[in-house]
Amino acid sequence: MQIIHTIQELRAWRKNAGTVAFVPTMGNLHEGHLALVREAKKRADNVVVSIFVNRLQFGQGEDFDKYPRTLQQDADKLEAEGVAVVFAPDEKELYPNVEQRYNVEPPNLQNELCGKFRPGHFLGVATVVSKLFNIVAPDVACFGKKDYQQLAVIKGLTEDLNFDVEIVPVDTGRAEDGLALSSRNQYLSAAERDEAPRLYRELKAVAESLAQGSLDYAGLEKRAVQSLTEYGWVVDYVEIRRVDTLEVARAGDKKLVVLAAARLGTTRLIDNLEIKLP
């Protein structure tokens, strides 16, 4: 396995690399990331994993500086999975100008759901993913469904900007108690970690009500928020939306997703659950 730090070197490698499946990450890899790598391996001759903590997608007061950087441990895990290349550029390599002059802005989604609480986040995501697609030139790219809004943004920019890459969504990896795997779970105290699976349980309760025919979307959302709040969560949102586009759900929609974001102590957790109605 090669660890490549420059765009020039990666492009030289890419010329003779056959088909490439790509998994972009910010490092600090866990089993959820490795599931993406395993899916990528099924789909191309070579797998490239990028590791880059992207300042542009962190808001003021977020955890950019304390976000764990664990390149050597990550590289060891990826080598064991048979990855061909780890692309680990530094900030100057990916953003040579102090200020990025041109950005990719996803207007329809950047101010909704997580975007409402993290201004500029999805502009940062869309910009860095566009840059990485141009550098890596993958045939396939794998993204986890845990970051559902991010996945929707990336699907949209891939279609609208004509990137020649197949986007492969991969199911959310979960701990045995249902908690979605996330690098931020390590910030939870022992008591918070015990409480954290409640977020997924609330999503399942909403899904169950929808499956039983409830059309009171606002009422279901409100009950989930109240339940989480009672147990000490600070809830950003619980919302029922249309799958893929994330448009507001309407009565009669058959493919739905319920999404949630909430803070437990100082840690912000997100999760979602897709629902197909008969």
Swiss-Prot record:
It comes from the Bacteria. It catalyses: (R)-pantoate + beta-alanine + ATP = (R)-pantothenate + AMP + diphosphate + H(+). ATP binds at residues 26-33, 144-147, 173, 181-184. GO terms for biological process: pantothenate biosynthetic process. Its main location: cytoplasm. InterPro entries: Cyt_trans-like (IPR004821), Pantoate_ligase (IPR003721), Pantoate_ligase_C (IPR042176), Rossmann-like_a/b/a_fold (IPR014729). GO terms for cellular component: cytosol. Keywords: ATP-binding, Cytoplasm, Ligase, Nucleotide-binding, Pantothenate biosynthesis. It is an enzyme of class 6 (ligase). Its EC number is 6.3.2.1. It is found in: Cytoplasm. Pathway: Cofactor biosynthesis; (R)-pantothenate biosynthesis; (R)-pantothenate from (R)-pantoate and beta-alanine: step 1/1. The active site is at H33 (proton donor). Catalyzes the condensation of pantoate with beta-alanine in an ATP-dependent reaction via a pantoyl-adenylate intermediate. The reaction proceeds by a bi uni uni bi ping pong mechanism. Homodimer. This is Pantothenate synthetase. The gene is panC.
